[in-house]
Amino acid sequence: MKAAGIATWIQSKFSFHTLFLLIFVGALLLRLWALDLKLFHHDEAVHAWFSYRLLQEGIYVYDPSYHGPFLYYATAGMFALLGDSDLVGRLLPALFGVSLIPLVYSIHRLGYLDERQTLLASFFIALSPEMVYFSRFLRQDIFQVAFTLLLLVALLYYHSHGRLRYAALAGLAAGLGMTLKEDMPLLLLILLLYGIYLLWSKKISLPCSWRRDALVSFFVFVGTMLLFYSSFGTHPEVIFGQILDPGYIQVNGLFSAINQTGWYRAAEHWISMHNMCRICGPWFFYLVLLILYELPILILAVAGTIQFTMRGFSLSKLL
């Protein structure tokens, strides 16, 4: 039986919601089964230790070498609720990894994906080697994927319904993403540029209340970052550096005061890191990994790009 025939037979035996639930349960099992089987990776051990220290001593100050604060506060919270162990440390990444599938369903509810596309997207997320791996790994990556997808869902709901709560949710998702890793600004820039393109080409329009909604979203976005990066107000110097100290500015100058902020130190640190050959390899290094581990998804991504640029091409012919 051909693949298309198998898919048709499965759809005739099971309803859409039954298949979706089976995919969700399968994703849950892949992410939770023997979650503490491996010893902590070096990165995981560092993150778990900082989280444990935060729980026990209440000590955390943003250090750009170890990325943003969200992971440490969230993991410390899990340790407080369930005890400190390898399993508990990896539990939140696993749950965030599973949350991607309900987020795909949310896009389906808006009509952007039909039932077959929703099942296919959920199936690939559930089985993707990289998604499964990082869902079982105490690092920022899977959280960033989840918050980016949540941001997309919030923006789509705002476009469809124009309600303030979706704008606020978009601001929260973007703000939380900014508290994870320093590459989130690049993801936000991509979304912003695409949004500007859609508005400029009149493919979308904004509701009458968009100014109010954008302002609320901005305050939620900034407020979320201020709370986390200042360690909930205990380390305002991460936000302001020495800008609020006139004596320091008088002696050392304004530029030196700005140099002490977490924002400046993060940019300085990661620019210097990228100027080093830390993980050397050819420009196509990650393309090889995609071909090796994610070939079906890569093929569909290329087909989707072709469909977007050549409107006469129908992706449904491939599905």
Protein language model regions, located:
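Short helix- or helix-capping micro-motifs
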Residues: F24-A27, A121-A126, A174, M178
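Transmembrane-lumen/periplasm boundary regions of multi-pass, lipid-linked membrane glycan transferases
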Residues: L30, V46-L55, H67, L81, ...
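Transmembrane-helix motifs of polytopic, lipid-linked glycan transferases
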Residues: V25, L91-L113, L150
